Design a protein with these regions (language model features):
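Conserved phosphate-coupling serine/threonine residues in phosphotransfer and NTP-handling enzymes
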Residues: 4-6
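Hydrophobic beta-strand core positions in alpha/beta domains
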Residues: 1-2, 79
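Asp-based, Mg2+/Mn2+-dependent phosphohydrolase catalytic module
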Residues: 8, 12-119
Length: 119
């Protein structure tokens, strides 16, 4: 799922432009929930729509409010440092990455216990 604070049309357009929409069953926007980030509602809504308990979810976040929302939802957070977001307070993260490199993707896969040979 994608659970973003951005308006739904922006999320959808971005995913379609990057040809990524086909990889996500659920796209949830902060404007679709009563309390957007840093409240947990966006993540809880995405998990509910997926039919997945929050203890089986993981969040990859690049904003302080998103990290706070993940913590409030009791979902582990992988922190993706975004140099374009200014000085962000890094939330309690189970893993930190600084770029979408092969090495960092492998770190995430290892953390999630994915067998990369089967992916």
């Amino acid at each position: 799922a994608v659970a973003s604070s951005s308006p739904k049309p922006v999320i959808t357009e971005t995913l379609e432009t990057l040809d990524l929409m086909k990889y996500f069953d659920v796209v949830t926007s902060g404007d679709e929930v009563k309390n957007p980030k840093p409240a947990p509602d966006t993540f809880l809504s995405a998990a509910k729509q997926l039919g997945v308990p929050v203890d089986e979810c993981i969040v990859i976040e690049d904003s302080t409010n998103g990290g706070k929302a993940a913590k409030a939802a009791k979902i582990p957070c992988i922190w993706m440092h975004n140099p374009d977001s200014g000085d962000q307070e890094i939330p309690d993260a189970v893993l930190e990455i600084t770029a979408w490199t092969k090495e960092n993707i492998e770190k995430i896969m290892k953390f999630l216990h994915f067998d990369q040979e089967k992916v």
